[in-house]
Amino acid sequence: MTVTEQCILYLASEKMFYRSIQKMTVTGIIAEYNPFHNGHQYQIDWVKKELKSDYIVVAMSGDYVQRGTPAILPKHTRAKMALLCGADLVLELPVQFSSASAEGFSTGAVSLLDGTGVVTHICFGSESGDTGRFLLAADLLNEEPAPYRTLLKKHLREGRSYPAARSQALCEYADAFHLPVSGREIAALLSSPNNILGIEYCRAIRRLKSNIAPVTLKRAGAGYHEQDLCGDSAPSATAIRSFLKQHGSFGLLSNKIPKEALEILSYMVKANAFVEEADLDLLLHYALLSSGDTYEEFLDISPEIAARIKNRLNEYRGFVQFCDLLKTKEITRTRIQRALLHLLLGIRSASQRVPYARVLGFRREALPLLNEIKKRGSLPLITKPANASSLLSPEASAFLEENTRASNIYESILCHKSGKPFKHEYQKQLVIL
């Protein structure tokens, strides 16, 4: 075969692949996998069966999660769990977004999936299972009609936390203006963290003018914050973390976590290679003492939170205890956790979009998809962070460096606990199955 014939054949195959990728269903999943469990497996299986997805792309939190704490296992380990259990490609959601409020978390994750140029759907779990209701609530919150804003301000003045004030304002607005959903239905929709995230995913899709279609899957198993492990084959990640803190038998997890993921989790815990909130105790105390009066420079630290930190600093005993000490009726514990984590990691500002797509791992069968992302995506695809500067703008490079510092802090905690050698973020290898 001549070189010309080879070129013609190559171009023809590329054209055929382009046509096939145009018809493909590529579903994005936004997750923490903290850790991976049967509920996550159920979602992946459902996406493949019901949506007929050709590929599943996961936007996964890195080493820190949305409630403002470190992930229990390192990001590459959790990415491997996901790939073994059916995901095709895992991208990192950087700490600036993974540790943000529901709105910031969702905006970052949706912008990341949208930036690949190939994701056609986003599937998220919810207690509702009705995508239409999520889109209605999302449009209402994006538009913020004047009567709704008035109700929101009223409930904030009454001393409610922002989530509680928003929920009450939406319920009253729905009833007063006879929306297709009642105030009671709105209240139910806003009653769980998964539903709230679902609304925020839909808001982000609308704001970013993305063509991605949202699809919600009704959750099976325990609720998001349910701490009871017994009697449920799909427990919450909260229940599993709580169980691990009690150092129970791994045999009790055998029907709650997929075999491949459980083997990894068991190995890491036995090696003491996992991170808990208490592992931040000394680092956070140092950060608080060395920050002087500059607390408000850090992301999510309001003047009120800064004042509470200053007034109660001498009572500091540890991360968990200090969060409990600082929370109020108006300021939730999760908001305090995020604020303190940002101070510890030195994160001072937020961003509107993720400026790159960092690959944590992929299945070999997904190589054609990676090639298509390189062609069609609007984000630089990063497989080797050490070489990323040539692909990134100065602002994006600074963003990556901030995320790298945060991951190196996580790695230092992990090494201190497990006794394993420190490995810089730039030295870590992709997970390829």
Placement of each model-derived feature along the sequence:
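Active-site cores that bind ATP or allylic diphosphates and position pyrophosphate for catalysis
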Residues: E92-L433
